[in-house]
């Protein structure tokens, strides 16, 4: 009999290790559901911000399961989603941020600083903005210290700036001021990375507006009974 290889298919059922099965089930349950039939999945709805425009039944199909999952997902499933891949990590970070599970602050901060995958940084920055404590400001500032000088990289600098400005607005602090000063690190990064005609859209006040919109929308959600 031919040897079964990990990841092979027998009767269309993947052969997995127990750990892989846990991750697969978590992805299927939390990452793949979609509120809109035209959507590629929850992760795509969160990434695109399309949910901000949802109305009526589509809005309910998006919000109710999302809020229920954010309040009920186990630590084991969150760890499974955070294990690898931008889609699961993005979704996990949103669930963490919605429920304000601050016990994951250090983990999300480490993932943000490592910047191993694309797109997931949106979720990390959203969650840290939702937490809005001095510790979150420190993490976001550390990210900007590391990546704003890297004008060869276009990662999550704008998202981190928006999140830090949002935290400042909540705490009455000015952690972002050194970065947003004229000629500061943020302006130099934007000037080096962004085309001149697009730079107004990356202004600090625009990044704050974008993050505030996400957090205000989340603040308006209620946990389903």
Regions found by a protein language model. Give the residues of each.
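N-terminal alpha-helical scaffold/docking segments in eukaryotic complex subunits
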Residues: 1-73, 181-225
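Amphipathic alpha-helical scaffolding segments comprising HEAT/armadillo-like alpha-solenoid repeats
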Residues: 70-81, 101-113, 133-147, 169-180, ...
């Amino acid at each position: 009999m031919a040897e079964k290889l990990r990841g092979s298919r027998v009767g269309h059922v993947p052969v997995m290790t127990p750990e892989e099965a846990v991750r697969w089930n978590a992805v299927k349950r939390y990452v793949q559901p979609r509120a809109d039939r035209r959507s590629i999945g929850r992760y795509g709805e969160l990434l695109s911000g399309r949910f901000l425009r949802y109305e009526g039944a589509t809005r309910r199909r998006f919000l109710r399961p999302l809020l229920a999952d954010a309040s009920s997902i186990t630590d084991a499933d969150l760890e499974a989603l955070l294990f690898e891949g931008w889609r699961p990590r993005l979704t996990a970070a949103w669930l963490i941020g919605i429920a304000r599970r601050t016990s994951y602050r250090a983990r999300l901060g480490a993932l943000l600083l490592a910047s191993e995958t694309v797109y997931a940084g949106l979720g990390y920055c959203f969650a840290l903005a939702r937490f809005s404590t001095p510790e979150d400001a420190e993490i976001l500032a550390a990210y900007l210290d590391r990546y704003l000088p890297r004008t060869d990289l276009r990662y999550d600098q704008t998202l981190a700036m928006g999140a830090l400005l949002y935290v400042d607005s909540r705490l009455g602090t000015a952690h972002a001021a050194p970065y947003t000063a004229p000629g500061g690190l943020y302006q130099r990064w934007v000037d080096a990375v962004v085309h001149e005609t697009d730079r107004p859209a990356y202004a600090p006040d625009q990044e704050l507006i974008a993050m505030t919109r996400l957090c205000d929308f989340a603040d308006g959600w209620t946990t389903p009974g």
